[in-house]
């Protein structure tokens, strides 16, 4: 993996992102002729969306609407909040986090865990907006309670345990590892 390079596609519709990525890849190939690549897209339900075929090694698609949907894990939020908040706010923040997830019906179904949960709600909800962007998002609710609590996406991800990371993410990194070993 020491020869990996990552480039963000900066959002937009999937077709435009792929076209920009293709141009970038063609330019890189002029410098490194044997370069390999892998493109990773959010799941798109629009009529113009394309979805990579299962055997495609260079195109990967999350099975959830936004990458933030993989951060819908209350315990990871609580651990992250405990790292940055004053001790006197910890219980209150934890309760607010639990209430948020319960209020949004984003709780684990019986006999499921975060790694294998398949409930459709985790795929289709707009995690980007409800967790971070909306005025009443979890991020903003917690920050209003304690201004020191600025839980960025990376902080939540770093607070996740291996068993809380969904199988989609494990699968992506396995594909990335396989690609790097083939290069």
Task: Walk through the language-model features, giving the residues of each.
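Generic alpha-helical secondary structure signal
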Residues: 28-29, 74, 177
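General structural signal for secondary-structure boundaries
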Residues: 11-17, 47, 73, 123-126, ...
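Conserved helicase/translocase motor-coupling segment
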Residues: 1-65
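Activity-critical C-terminal alpha-helical subdomain
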Residues: 36-130
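Short runs of predominantly hydrophobic/aromatic residues within well-ordered alpha helices
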Residues: 14, 64-68, 135, 169
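Charge-biased C-terminal accessory regions appended to nucleic-acid-, cytoskeletal NTPase
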Residues: 90-183
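Generic serine detector
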Residues: 2, 36, 46, 58, ...
